[in-house]
Amino acid sequence: MTEVGVAVVPVAAILPLRAAVLRPGLPVEEARYEEDELSATLHLAAYDADGRVVGCSTWFPDPLDGRDAWRLRGMATAPEVRGSGVGARLVEAGLAVGTERGYGLTWCNARTPAVGFYRRYGFVPVGEEFLAVHDIPHYLMVREART
């Protein structure tokens, strides 16, 4: 596992990585979300030993099917650290905050190749595959809090 620290940061700290991984070739502003500046939004950065941001995730309240829920969006890891546990640290940290805030349901729209990754943390695909931004295949994935 790559040695990383995870910290709560302002969106400006993670936007360059989010843009490079999730919106390659587009202006950085294309990677901004409406929810980025909400007071309840949580931005997490994973830092390597040199202080470089190598992973990021954004979490915020967003109801699903009429239920209060915690949503994960903008999950990204630098290509050179994929498979090293950086993503795991980010998901575990974000889920822990959701639990602290009382959310029993967490959800995300996961890119199809990442479905297996999210399954490891208790997320389950719901419904059919769909095309999201820039026609990239995704699945809605939900996770009920473990009791």
Tell what function each PLM region has.
Residues 45, 52-62, 68-76:
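Conserved beta-strand in the GNAT
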Residues 78, 82, 111:
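Residue-level recognition of the GNAT/N-acetyltransferase active site
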Residues 18, 118, 123:
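Conserved active-site tyrosine of GNAT-family acetyltransferases
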Residues 91, 98-111:
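Conserved GNAT acetyl-CoA-binding A-motif
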Residues 18-49, 53:
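Active-site rim helix/loop that mediates acceptor-substrate recognition in acyltransferases
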Residues 1-15:
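A short beta-loop-alpha structural element at the N-terminal edge
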Residues 81, 85-93:
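Conserved acetyl-CoA pyrophosphate-binding loop and the N-cap/start of the following alpha-helix
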Residues 107-109, 124-140:
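Conserved catalytic-core motifs of GNAT/GCN5-like acyltransferases
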